[in-house]
Amino acid sequence: MTRVKNSVVARARHKKILKQAAGYYGARSRTYRVAYQSVIKSGQYSYRDRRQKKRLFRRLWINRINAASRKYGMSYNHLINGLQKCNVCINRKMLADIAIFDRETFSALIDKAKINCEHT
């Protein structure tokens, strides 16, 4: 039986991993075994952090809205509750941008939420 040589395939596989590990420090960019572990782990971190990024940005928007609404004497949860009762459909990303860049509109939204909170 003839011997099957797979050196071409193995070299291609190793080159692919080492190319992905380019820029890593020390043996992580030069040695296949260590580079493979680093590439796998970096993929896990990337997968996890793509999901965490969404949570972190939502937290940032909520913090910004809370800080801006407290300048007008209203807490974040009262603002959101008042806007929902007024049927104002605006997401937290847009609300945070309005709070930073368009203070007149934000103060109008605060007034609208305050009026609605007083009725209930």
Curated annotation (Swiss-Prot):
The name under which this protein is listed is: Large ribosomal subunit protein bL20
Q: Name one GO cellular component term.
A: ribosome
| Role played | Binds directly to 23S ribosomal RNA and is necessary for the in vitro assembly process of the 50S ribosomal subunit. It is not involved in the protein synthesizing functions of that subunit.
Q: Which InterPro entries match?
A: Ribosomal_bL20, RIBOSOMAL_L20_CS, Ribosomal_protein_bL20_C
Q: So which domain of life are we looking at?
A: Bacteria
NCBIfam families linked to this entry: rplT_bact (TIGR01032)
Report keywords, A-Z. Ribonucleoprotein, Ribosomal protein, RNA-binding, rRNA-binding
Q: Answer whether the UniProt record assigns the keyword RNA-binding to this protein.
A: yes
Q: Which family does this protein fall into?
A: Belongs to the bacterial ribosomal protein bL20 family.
Q: Which GO terms describe its molecular function?
A: rRNA binding; structural constituent of ribosome
What's an example Gene Ontology biological process for this entry?
Answer: ribosomal large subunit assembly
In terms of PANTHER family, this protein maps to:
39S RIBOSOMAL PROTEIN L20
Q: Does the keyword Ribosomal protein apply?
A: yes
